[in-house]
Swiss-Prot record:
Protein's name according to its UniProt entry: Ribonuclease Z
Source species taxonomy: Eukaryota, Fungi, Dikarya, Ascomycota, Saccharomycotina
PANTHER family: ZINC PHOSPHODIESTERASE ELAC PROTEIN 2
GO BP terms, alphabetized: mitochondrial tRNA 3'-end processing; tRNA 3'-end processing
Keyword Zinc part of the UniProt annotation: yes
Catalytic reaction annotation: Endonucleolytic cleavage of RNA, removing extra 3' nucleotides from tRNA precursor, generating 3' termini of tRNAs. A 3'-hydroxy group is left at the tRNA terminus and a 5'-phosphoryl group is left at the trailer molecule
Gene: TRZ1
Amino acid sequence: MFTFIPITHPTSDTKHPLLLVQSAHGEKYFFGKIGEGSQRSLTENKIRISKLKDIFLTGELNWSDIGGLPGMILTIADQGKSNLVLHYGNDILNYIVSTWRYFVFRFGIDLNDHIMKDKEVYKDKIIAVKSFNVLKNGGEDRLGVFDSFQKGVLRSIVAKMFPKHAPTDRYDPSSDPHLNVELPDLDAKVEVSTNYEISFSPVRGKFKVEEAIKLGVPKGPLFAKLTKGQTITLDNGIVVTPEQVLENERHFAKVLILDIPDDLYLNAFVEKFKDYDCAELGMVYYFLGDEVTINDNLFAFIDIFEKNNYGKVNHMISHNKISPNTISFFGSALTTLKLKALQVNNYNLPKTDRVFSKDFYDRFDTPLSRGTSMCKSQEEPLNTIIEKDNIHIFSQNKTVTFEPFRMNEEPMKCNINGEVADFSWQEIFEEHVKPLEFPLADVDTVINNQLHVDNFNNSAEKKKHVEIITLGTGSALPSKYRNVVSTLVKVPFTDADGNTINRNIMLDAGENTLGTIHRMFSQLAVKSIFQDLKMIYLSHLHADHHLGIISVLNEWYKYNKDDETSYIYVVTPWQYHKFVNEWLVLENKEILKRIKYISCEHFINDSFVRMQTQSVPLAEFNEILKENSNQESNRKLELDRDSSYRDVDLIRQMYEDLSIEYFQTCRAIHCDWAYSNSITFRMDENNEHNTFKVSYSGDTRPNIEKFSLEIGYNSDLLIHEATLENQLLEDAVKKKHCTINEAIGVSNKMNARKLILTHFSQRYPKLPQLDNNIDVMAREFCFAFDSMIVDYEKIGEQQRIFPLLNKAFVEEKEEEEDVDDVESVQDLEVKLKKHKKN
């Protein structure tokens, strides 16, 4: 038996479909897209992937499609997995993985790629997968975009990213001549969709013992040979074939997984599959991009698979106007609801509304909730020969099991289980919140009066105040209750005419930051947030702090591309700038023209500006590969001397554009090229003394000298990491993080007026340590929770509900799991050594 389990489907915070195929013995395969949030969905649903060995990527490979893959690979490696194969139909895959070389590094896992030609078959003892590569505009399949030399370079880089043995304790990929290499140029965007046919090895028929004995076969080794499908000859010369003593083989239905990115692919798909042999086809999964129109043209293609097989094929459709916008992360949503019951104006109810395809739902007579928004693509009803019972909506709970059947004797066995459950905030409130008996928390106050309320920047008073949204507040990797870190700070500015202009600044953006924004806000509010987004700041290169930035940049461009005067400042360690350039050349070059990049190092509060290393040119890298290992290890990269000169002109322009008085960084005590920062904003054009200073620690040990007493001193707001509880000081020292008390100590020495503590270890996912902390000298402080919206003027209001917070999470504590905070190769080495000792 084989089970197909949807891991994600198109929702606000999981944009694409991902399918897990699992055998009866536990072998696992992924098919589809590894979008941001995929790993968190596995955690939410307690799905283990220790037996995962193959990932078959479908469709195109934009960041939206595979933004969750880097984090997924890191986690799989940290779990001790020794091998993983990525399958795809174009060698752009190696380029993609190579772009991650400055921030994805794990030893002990053998990561391989398998570039599949059109109609090539990959086979193991369980499964056979045939690829179908469809070019956007038709034509002959072009397997690759690189020549043999370039392919060799890319493969070498990927191999060095995943070495067999651990490097020295201090390792900087940007100083490794095998990683800091110029990547090959891309001439054009790769527009190919990879699709798959899945078939399973048949089940051998039962051995008919009595029949074998009748034929004179003695018990023993000859029975075994016949069972294995071997023909035997008896002593009397009689030949006995397996067919004489075995029941008929049992087969499984075939499955197609088709990924159509947009309407321009449709004709090529029709051409590719018009003569497809539908015999034994039991299910077709359609992974439809947002730009695919639900109309007759689409269903004319789908009808192809009904020919000579009418009524026998099931069709499972994934599309953002068909699949429900269900809550993907219920644990997180329930946490938000409980916190909202305590501070109703500090949280938005997660959005579950969606505009559905009226064409689809009318044609297949599928019910929707009252008041659902719908849209039509054509005037006439959908024209298709598919019956209602054979069309299915792809969603997280819609599992399919395939069981073996005897061909020509019984029908294919394809069992579809699971329906979308009705979702009601009111019912969830009654079940999980009402029993807590919070004062003033009733269903009208928390739910009914808040269904369409946006609590961010929603009053005349708030429009004049600094506001903070702690989008993600966890460390290392996404958990059930906290996503990885990201903070949005809105700083208003009053111009000479008294008009208020917002400056939104994003401080770090871990994986699926955009998904959180989409779940929190309406489309109109999202547009406003991104039109006001002026800067993205990245503190360091650990993946949990930046895997969401590309999605944020794409979303910013979506709402600002028509305004040619609009730019976004991106302030990051220099290596991340290289990644952005390499990635956006692949996906959307136009965004690069609208990014103004400045290195974190150019804001350093020091006379010494550290130089970045120069990348090795491709031609020179070829010579390095020919050298022996001793020569390789002794080779040093050259420094880029120009990089030590601050980009003063661009910094001045940023100061002017964003009305900034000072922007300073200091080196964080964490990993190489890690920073803390302080930004002083002007607040009123008519009052030069009206300023607001915000400081952000990033990840660091307490840095009193440089951060508290120098760049951050007298901050109006300090946002500081508080990764570990106070009793875990030894862990904090080892991992170069802060305990809660240490973070408070930094604030006290800084003389910060207000303090927000964030970036909590996922070992304590719901509630940080509220008591036994040292005194906070700041006027007000609070602990950050995911999706929390807080007015700077009211940061201290959370302290009033501290006594109720422990009560709020009694239910969750009963099922709490201890998740290790693994951030570095050294953490993994320690774990492996302990394991060997045991």
